[in-house]
Amino acid sequence: MPPKSRSTGPKKTQKTRRRDKKNIPHGAAHIKSTFNNTIVSITDPAGNVISWASSGHVGFKGSRKSTPFAAQLAAESAARKAQEHGVKKVDVFVKGPGSGRETAIRSLQAAGLEVGTISDVTPQPHNGCRPPKRRRV
């Protein structure tokens, strides 16, 4: 019995799903600023992420990710993407002890988003995990 020939017809191309533009005038900006990185997520009122950016995503590597300038560029990038979806006003929620907290908030304002309330939602342990040992330099 001869082997079955494979069809060499047209290849099926897989469609990539394009994100449709939503019109969300009011959102929330979540800024997570750690000692190593800064992540900015802009969400709709239900908490679904519209746009995000981080210091590493913007193009910084290593210890430069933790700088305030990297946080500024990350916030500008996230704000630009969010404005394409119609976001004009945001409430800011800041989490973490990093150096890019204030810079990220200022650059959201500079990018054209109106900042409503600013809340610090850094989690505080009620004597939970033991913290890492002190650095000796």
Swiss-Prot record:
Short name of any one Pfam family annotated for the protein: Ribosomal_S11
GO CC annotations, alphabetized: ribonucleoprotein complex; ribosome
Gene Ontology biological-process entries: translation
Keyword Mitochondrion: no
Ranges of Polar residues composition bias in the record: 1-10
Segments of this protein annotated with the region Disordered: 1-27, 116-137
Signal peptide (UniProt feature, chain positions): none
GO molecular function: rRNA binding; structural constituent of ribosome
InterPro entries the record matches: Ribosomal_uS11, Ribosomal_uS11_bac-type, Ribosomal_uS11_CS, Ribosomal_uS11_sf
Keywords: Ribonucleoprotein, Ribosomal protein, RNA-binding, rRNA-binding
Feature: compositional bias, Basic residues: 12-21
Function: Located on the platform of the 30S subunit, it bridges several disparate RNA helices of the 16S rRNA. Forms part of the Shine-Dalgarno cleft in the 70S ribosome.
Binding partners and assembly: Part of the 30S ribosomal subunit. Interacts with proteins S7 and S18. Binds to IF-3.
Family, per entry: Belongs to the universal ribosomal protein uS11 family.
Name the UniProt record assigns to this protein: Small ribosomal subunit protein uS11
Organism: Rhodococcus erythropolis (strain PR4 / NBRC 100887)
